[in-house]
Each structure stands twice: as C-alpha cells, then as structure tokens.
Amino acid sequence: EDFVTSAGAAVGRVDAFNDEYDGTRQDRIRYDTPSFGGFKVSVSHANDDRNDYALRYGGSFSGVKVKGAIGYGQNEANTQRNVTKGSIGVLLPMGLSFQFAAGERDLDAAAGRNDPSMQYYRIGYRFKGSELGETRLAASYHDAEDFSANGDELQIISVAVVQIIEPLGAELYAGYSNLDLETTATANIEDIDIVTVGLRVNF
C-alpha cells in the first residue's frame, strides 16, 4: 500500500516508514538451549555473516501467564542492519491481556541520522460470550519513527474482533486499522484506512 498526498502525489510505500523487525527468511544454522526455569537461549548464523541472539521466557504465576523475549541481530556486512528488539505479553486469569514490543536499528555508519525505532502496545480481552466459542477483542497502537528520514513518524491504530466457532473448527474475524504518516519533506499526506473481514477454517 502507498501513501499519497491530498493532491494524489505518491509519497512512498508503508514499509518504507516502518519495520517490525521480523527478521529475514534465509538459510541458517540455529541452536536452542533446553529450557531452564522458563528461560531459553537461541543463537543462529546465516549467510553474509548474519548472527542472531535471543533470550526467551515463558511461565505462569498464580494463573497469570507471561511470555517475553529480547534479541539482537548482527549483520557484519551491513552495520546499519544491526537491530535490538524485545517484547512481553501477559494474560490474566479473567481474560484480560497486555502486550508491549519495541525495537531500534543501529545507524552508526550514517552520519546525522537518528536511529529508527518502533513501539507497539496492545490490550485484549477474551471471554465465552456464546455457545459458539470464545470471543476475542483487541486494540493496539503502533508508532514508528525516523525510518525513512529524521522526523518521520508513522502511527497505526487498530481494533479487531475474533469469534471462535468451535463446532466448525473455524475463526470469524474482522478488523480496522488507521495509518497516519507525518514527514518533514511532504505535507498533507492522506491517511490509509484498512478494513479486514475473513473466515479461517482449520482442517
């Protein structure tokens, strides 16, 4: 999807102003340690001297489930691709959940450039509203800064609902997202609105 101005001029693709630090899809060698007290360490090596390191945790306390991870991605061939990232999620017994994620790219080799960064916040609630199955509600806020240039900021607000249909082994879902971009180089950029509706059936 592309951003455009109110006059219809192209500004750029959404992914030019955002990065969720999902990593690359390359052949790699990876080792995961056994779990110790809920903690696990992962190390991997891929082509072009790419190395990834991660510490993960999963556990529960008095019915409260917690999952978290922190990682560092190192690219010896391109130091501008070194990334630090982390996330944590908490699910309470009554069905309320919270998630937070953040990441930053190291641009040491780029003089005068701010390090691009992102933050993600999400709140959710799940309950058994009918005989069909569990209903899940969620709202999230995503903020990405300085990815294309210093001072650029992309904000994404999303809401979603998922209805589990247990007799069919299916999920009915709907969502809405608003993407708002502010840049130092271009004014009057139009928001992007996305509506998603679908049905997923598990076989």
Model regions: which residues?
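C-terminal closing repeat unit and adjoining cap/tail of repeat-based domains
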Residues: S158-L181
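Detector for outer-membrane/organellar transmembrane beta-barrel domains
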Residues: Y53-I164
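Flexible, glycine-rich linker and terminal segments associated
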Residues: E134-A138, E171, V201-F203
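Surface-exposed coil loops of outer-membrane beta-barrel proteins
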Residues: E1-D49
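Flexible, solvent-exposed loop segments that connect beta-strands
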Residues: F3-A16, L107-R113, F147-G151, E182-N188
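Short secondary-structure boundary/capping elements
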Residues: D22-G23, Q80, E153, D191
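Outer-membrane beta-barrel "beta-signal"
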Residues: D191-F203
